[in-house]
From Swiss-Prot:
Signal peptide: none annotated. Gene3D superfamilies: P-loop containing nucleotide triphosphate hydrolases, Probable tRNA modification gtpase trme, domain 1, tRNA modification GTPase MnmE domain 2. Its EC number is 3.6.-.-. K(+) binds at N225, T244, I246, T249. GO terms for molecular function: GTP binding; GTPase activity; metal ion binding. This is tRNA modification GTPase MnmE. InterPro entries: G_TrmE, GTP-bd, GTP-bd_TrmE_N, GTPase_MnmE, MnmE_dom2, MnmE_helical, P-loop_NTPase, Small_GTP-bd. The gene is mnmE.
Length: 453
């Protein structure tokens, strides 16, 4: 942990109405004495001159001093809030550096100091960057929930439950001569099942939070001339893709990034899937499958004039069999303007089926509502937390250890192995909040922050 005093511009570079210089560390009070001529009263706004070493006024503004540990970073912090001209701010930083023993902060270093001083955990620190980078109202709300500790609370509860169960299992191992067989009395199994159920709920919320942050990737797939490019244009609200009556017009991947009521959506239009000897088309089809395999959702586009079937296993079994087992599929029966089908949604064999006309726009609004629902629009209006991919990976790892532990208990009654899986689960969960996290990971996380944060 560094003990350096650091300085950086806390406001965005460039011209603005107000510019803020932030100093954190033991020398913050020395900077105040050198630049202001006095140490401001803690937590009081002090309007004063910011002076050079020769006594000339560089700027005028408000100085705020926070005595550690009662500050954002947990250290002494001085903020100089002056006019937002970049030249003035650069002069002020240069003046601060003249005090000696002070260096320019690295990206995210103020937040890193706050984390190191237990002022916030890692998910809260990440939420600061996510709040700054939010591209929608929903992302901002979710990031604020994480910043206020909602995600951390869920993870801490899981860690506590896993730790308590682990202690109970280890106690059962240490006292094998007791009359009660702790490993088979049902208490351990019931506690384990409750933890698994709780983790499933947190995983579901985290996945929604990740979609809010990163967007949901939706791939439009199907046979040539089913109307995939027309649907891309309808969802994007503009002519992004060339549409013709010639099958196989789209030979490469087309992407559009849109927002549905603040929810980010990445729409991928792909080449029509079919057997072909055309080398260029074969490459496009291979790329289409690459996109499908990494999608969050597939819109299976069907030309409604060619079949009355609604079950994808009936329409194209080979296509369905090749899809990843955990990939959600929505069936889109297109060209409803020609088939005369009612624009309704039905559930068929576990699949949502929509009838639309991508050409005329009929049914597209209902499809948008469906996509919003998949992204958790309503739940995020009510309040959710934001999550990153590393959080999802850690939760998945923890879930895997719980499932292995369940097997050790149910099949083998192996208490030692169950305890070890619980320990590994505990470590995976603790990495989310930063309780047990490598320095390399911390460096990677904080280096992505803005300078001055």
């Amino acid at each position: 942990m560094t003990t350096d005093t650091i300085v950086a511009q806390a406001t965005a570079p460039g011209r603005g109405g107000v510019g803020i210089i932030r100093i954190s560390g033991d020398k913050a009070s020395d900077v105040a004495m050198a630049v202001l001529g006095h140490l401001p009263k803690t937590r009081y706004a002090d309007y004063c001159d910011f002076k050079s070493a020769s006594g000339q006024v560089i700027d005028q503004g408000i100085a705020l001093f926070f005595k550690g540990p009662n500050s954002f970073t947990g250290e002494d912090v001085l903020e100089l809030q002056g006019h937002g001209g970049q030249i003035v701010l650069d002069m002020l930083i240069k003046r601060v550096m003249e005090v000696g023993g002070i260096r320019i902060a690295k990206p995210g270093e103020f937040s890193e100091q706050a984390f190191m001083n237990d002022k916030l955990d890692l998910t809260q620190a990440e939420a600061i960057a996510d709040l700054i980078d939010a591209t929608s109202e929903q992302a901002a709300k979710s990031a604020l929930q994480s910043l206020q500790g909602e995600f951390s609370k869920e993870v801490h509860e899981l860690v506590d439950q896993v730790t308590n169960l682990r202690l109970y299992v280890e106690a059962a191992i240490d006292f094998p001569d007791e009359e009660v067989d702790f490993l088979s009395d049902g208490k351990i199994a019931n506690a384990l099942y409750k933890i698994i159920d709780k983790l499933d709920l947190v995983q579901a919320s985290a996945k929604q939070g990740s979609i809010i942050r990163e967007g949901m990737k939706v791939v439009i797939a199907g046979r040539p001339n089913a109307g995939k490019s027309s649907l891309l244009n309808a969802l994007a609200g503009k002519e992004s893709a060339i549409v013709t009556e010639i099958a196989g017009t789209t030979r490469d991947v087309l992407r559009e990034h849109i927002h549905l009521d603040g929810m980010p959506l990445h729409i991928i239009d792909t080449a029509g899937l079919r057997d072909t000897n055309d080398t260029v088309e074969q490459i496009g089809i291979e790329r289409a499958w690459n996109e499908i395999n990494s999608a969050d959702r597939v819109l299976f586009m069907v030309d409604g004039t060619t079949t009355a079937a609604v079950d994808p296993h009936t329409i194209w079994p080979d296509f369905v069999d090749r899809l990843p087992s955990n990939l959600g599929v929505t069936v889109i029966r297109n060209k409803a303007d020609l088939t005369g089908e009612d624009l309704m949604m039905t559930e068929e064999q576990g699949y949502s089926v929509y009838r639309i006309s991508a050409k005329t726009g009929l049914g597209v609004e209902e499809l948008k509502q469906h996509l919003k629902s998949l992204m958790g629009y309503q739940s995020n209006l009510e309040g959710g937390f934001i999550a990153r991919r590393r959080h999802l990976e850690a939760l998945e790892l923890a879930a895997g250890h719980l499932q292995l532990g369940k097997e050790q208990l149910e099949v083998y009654l192996a208490g030692e192995l169950l305890a070890e899986e619980l320990r590994m689960c505990q470590l995976a969960l603790s990495e989310i909040t930063g309780r047990f996290t490598s320095d390399d990971l911390l460096g990677k996380i904080f280096s992505s922050f803005c300078i001055g944060k």
